[in-house]
């Protein structure tokens, strides 16, 4: 491997990776084999930063849309008179963006990254337009699904484009900047959503995406001119039928369909239908069949699969997927239900609820900086995984103790602990997966952990909403004047219509319902301890793999 590294570095000069002459003979200078390393295009510094900043803006928009609805859920429940559908506003976006990422990983290897990225951005804008115009809950959910598909190709596309235009020795800084923008967007989404909704209306949370997306498209059209990729590894031109034939549509369809069935079953079971209802049972059965079929299909497809099953032989990679599954759900439980707690229990506005969550924002950003610097010197991941489990478990337990009379100091302190634990856990899942695999498989590492995070978020939100809905529906039995239709009108309506005594009962019930959501976070964070026996305490600094 050392010889390969030396050989590769000898072909790099002035930030441009040169191809051997034999690989460039009789080949159009603007067309490169997709699986070779193309020469980096010569672009000006202004063009480079314009492209990277536009990619960062697109990634920011995609991540922002993932959590911007968190603080809007009370308003949307009142607007659409549909409390039961609240979980789908966030879950369907995560479902579509997560399940399509492996497919987009293949697409970016086969088609022009410029036009595919712009297409994904247009799809995201189209979904935002549908949400902005929605007059009922089903239309809004469809818009979120469309936007999620577009978002699925934006982050992977941004990282792919950076690899095409940035020299290797500078690439980490640029990809880190895009990743940081995505992380910040995920956390401040509720704050921005609250500020926009309180001042100019919640629909502008989606209208505002359109001009930003148009500006990003214009910058890429003007500045970004990548080499075309229409040749096979042997240098023979490929037809579009051959390109399309290399894509695993069947696997993608089975994965998406299975997770949709699981999400519906978790959402409907115990609320809309009984768990023993034939529809719920059928959904669970179909999920099992599709999931097993998808697993077998991925094994059969080998290297052409969305996810090469050979990677599952890597212990460190499996552990990172498990951590991504646990900590992803832990983080989403708070991002979606803390704003609800602040608005329903504390009577905060949407902006106020977002501001109240700033301790979590600061904790996540702070722990990522500290952990990143420390790991760069020590190369040891295991201590931070242990710390993440401890802090996330303790923090989730402390959030579970939230009551209407909890002091502001404790609310802030508990969020700091929770944010540090969940933030460190998600970060270490990505770093661990990349450290566990060969450099050629790093794209699978990031995509796989992102998939686990998204799927964990989908399942967590569905389970939390199931528990939440069952708890608040009990108010119809305790308070004679409260019906399911009344509950669908939202928290503000309850504050204005119930007597002080009745409202006290309602507040306690809502507090218990949100505590149930935090209970899911406790279970997931504590479950991450099951991975401790498989941790590698060796330094990964300078190594290709974390596991032997």
Curated annotation (Swiss-Prot):
Q: Which residues cross the membrane?
A: 43-63, 85-105, 114-134, 146-166, 177-197, 204-224, 250-270, 280-300, 316-336, 357-377, 382-402, 411-431, 444-464, 518-538
Annotated S-S bridges? none
Q: Name its cellular compartments.
A: Membrane
Region of interest: Disordered: 1-33
Q: Which GO molecular function annotation, any one, does this entry have? A: toxin transmembrane transporter activity
Q: Show the GO cellular component annotation of the record.
A: membrane; plasma membrane
CDD domains, sorted: MFS_Azr1_MDR_like
Entry superkingdom: Eukaryota
What's the chief localization of this chain? membrane
Position of the signal peptide: none
Q: Fetch the Gene3D superfamilies from UniProt.
A: MFS general substrate transporter like domains (1.20.1250.20)
**Ranges annotated as biased composition (Basic and acidic residues):** 14-27
**Deleted gene: phenotype:** Leads to lethality.
Also noted in the record is: The genes involved in HC-toxin biosynthesis, called collectively TOX2, are organized into a diffuse cluster that spans >500 kb. All of the known genes are duplicated or triplicated within this region, with some variation in copy number and chromosomal location among different race 1 strains.
Please report the name of this protein according to its UniProt entry.
MFS-type transporter TOXA
Q: Which gene encodes it?
A: TOXA
